[in-house]
């Protein structure tokens, strides 16, 4: 396109210098408004579960199976079968998951968007998704891209002779890139220096190299990799050194050593890598490619640019002599040869079998045979002593290996979906797995008539409003919208490790739980017909009762909606190691920070709020309400800007915004003193999290709404709505929970238990 004779136009919408250019440390409140209805093209009433359940899954599987061998001239299938390509596609969709914060994974179909669609580790997966488009087009919104990517991998394995463990749908698409996922600080493709230069908070947690401390919550060795470089750490083709990184990154995605070996060896039973020529033949990634590429990228100028001339990783390895059929070829070759270092046609380090005959088929020329080859990370399974023992056991026991791979693959592709209650479809396995955070099925009923007497008993128990509300918050606020883990259901707050977390003040928590357990026991022992209440429900009900009491003290009659149906998990149903990652390093809602961090406390509050799926107004209402209710960790009264604590007022906002108060930092601390501007008398103390609601322009604007003369009634409604949202975040049994609100316009009276929760 010629620019000759054109007028300059440099002020396109969104262009120019942005606020973030001027103020790089600007608080990322935008993270609380992503994936809203404004970006969703589907109708407001669209119900994905209903759409998926109407899908003819058998017909879809048949169409996918037919695609596997329907090689297209524009992107020919290796060995005449797309199965290995689709296995890689599914693996890389799910494999971004990291258990540190639950982000990444396959659950939102993010492989379609930047940065994932343009990562160097995802070269050629643009073609895989484009091959799928006719099938996605045929079935429309009955299956999301997120579900289709994983189902295609499942079908690919099946068509290559492998029996999978099962498949569950239920992943709803998003329609824009995630903005909340921290992939690292590096600014170059495949950079890895900054993530290993963060100090003590980055220590290896999974038996990795103590000299390579990977920053949390990252689970990849380099920027834009799923895991670690297959050529070895920092280009060093050392299988033993590579094993350190493998153990670290797979551990961070919740895989143990056996699962790690099963996934690597099982995945490498199929297909090949691609490094037919030098990398400088490969063009720009999809996000940078020209419009004429129509969303594809990495245009290859080497030879035909496809088929035998494909360049992906730069490595040219085929692991098995049956690359489209499940078998033991990977282990047979791994242990059947000695290996010597060589280079691929692209110049990358890889390994070739010594004194071997050509037994490996050529991907596009049936008349040719190739020498067995391996990656540095493949040899880690032989030369790391722990991995070697597992690998030899698998090699000697093919059925054990097949079962281990099936289970590990299912875990890989479903780990970020949360509990089984979210699973859809006829292929959901019946076996309950510990990593699914199982909760017993509901075995009791509770009626509306039971609720009011229980509240009276709770309020007469001697527990304070702060104790009731704090315990309910501690139970429910473990929920993570990223991988749908945590929450109040299961009452795991009474179990290890949650009962011992510092943020939960174990001694105080034990006192509250003892009282609630007594109330539970007395109630259950006197009820006929199997009627009872779980501790999980009672904790939430008690929190609501505390809020009602606090509102009453402020002159408001409020009914906090309550939906029973939670159950109590056992310690045996709780993997303490897996749950340990849910321990908050900071909870700004309780003014808690576990230690010193490079990230300011207010940014950690935003991170917590985003994991709780809160909007900025919901976060603001909750912080203001919890402060005046004296919901704090520890004995400090930071942020309790009220003379009547445990009363639900707007005092937090009015006193924070009061210009009669002058704030000054306390030397050496992240806390502040608020003194009377005229007399110098100390009035309040607060943290960075408290003061940000008066300092940040957006949060101040929200605070002003509640601090206004007509703001109290709205604050009460908004606080109750946000509270009930958090209490019910893990209630996947409640219908149609896509977006919802609480109608608090007519609060007096005791409604049906869940009638006040309206879904939209």
From Swiss-Prot:
InterPro entries: Catalase_peroxidase, Haem_peroxidase, Haem_peroxidase_sf, Peroxidases_AS, Peroxidases_heam-ligand_BS. One of its GO terms (cellular component) is cytosol. Belongs to the peroxidase family. Peroxidase/catalase subfamily. The active site is at 92 (proton acceptor). This is Catalase-peroxidase. Homodimer or homotetramer. It comes from Burkholderia cepacia. Heme b binds at residue 268. There is a cross-link at residues 91-227 (Tryptophyl-tyrosyl-methioninium (Trp-Tyr) (with M-253)). GO terms for biological process: cellular response to hydrogen peroxide; hydrogen peroxide catabolic process. The gene is katG. It catalyses: H2O2 + AH2 = A + 2 H2O; 2 H2O2 = O2 + 2 H2O. Its cofactor is heme b. Its EC number is 1.11.1.21.
